[in-house]
Structure formats: structure tokens, C-alpha cells
Amino acid sequence: MKERVITAILLIGSVLGAPPVLSAQGPNPRGETALGEGEVIVEYGRPSTRGRDMISMMRPGSYWRLGADTNTVLESEVPLLLGDTTVPAGSHILLAHLAEPGQWELVVCKSVGDNFTPQETLATVPLTFEEGHPHVELLTLNLEGSGESAMLVITWGAYRLTASFSTD
């Protein structure tokens, strides 16, 4: 009995005296859809606008990794057709490129490393850019559609960017 009391006191003391454990945030959010004979997934970090208008702060010619803290990754079990370009199955980085004010492009890169260079571009397709949507505080990337074609829908703040793709 005495041993149980001592064990309980030591256990309670160690818990009360232990530094707080901060849990890591869960996995990055994902957009996913079945396409053709496989699945397509987009995984990204999810920044908040916090009162900022980040999209309007971008300069023409700049690239945006479409997320926070890490690259946005497209994983596909099937080859994809973006515009006239076939992107092989596998993992790739997604970026948005502001070619000029109001003119956006979706860029798919070979690498999933940290640094992007234009030489790694596999495909570039126009993004449809729309303003005036209801405010979305947290960046959201969704894959809408199934069967043979789908659309990547990016919403953040009052903006919406979209690009269509299909199985090859």
C-alpha cells in the first residue's frame, strides 16, 4: 500500500512539474478526387489572410507556392493533361505565377524539393482569376470533378483562381 501511495505521489508530481507539451499541428490539408483509373491529391500549407490582401501585394513576374510553410504538392496516380502538355504520374510542385496584373498561370514542376527554378517547369496553363467572392480567411485548394476531368479551385480572401485538367 505504501509503495502505491509513493508511486502515485511521484507520478502526480512528475506530471505537474513537467513542461507543457505542444502538439504539432495535424497534417496539411488535402484536396483529392478520383480521376480516370487513379487518384489525384493536392497537399498544401494553409495560410490565413489576417486582414491582408496578399494576392494584390504580389508583383508581376513573381511566383507563389500556393500555401504556407511548405511547397504545394500535386500527387497523381495517372498522367494528367494540362492544356496541351502531359504531366506524368507522380509527385510535383504546384506554383502560381503572376505573369502580369490579373493574369495568372498554374505552373507544374518536376521537383518536389524546396527551390524552384524555371528549368523544372513541366507545364504552364492559364488560371482563371475572379475577384469579388465572399471572403475566405484560410487558403483553400479543392479538386472538383471526377471521371476524366477535374478543376483545381483556389480560394483565398475575395479571390478565386481555377484551372481545368484531365487524364491523358
Model-derived regions, located:
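Primarily secretory-pathway and cell-envelope proteins
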Residues: 22-62, 98, 113-168
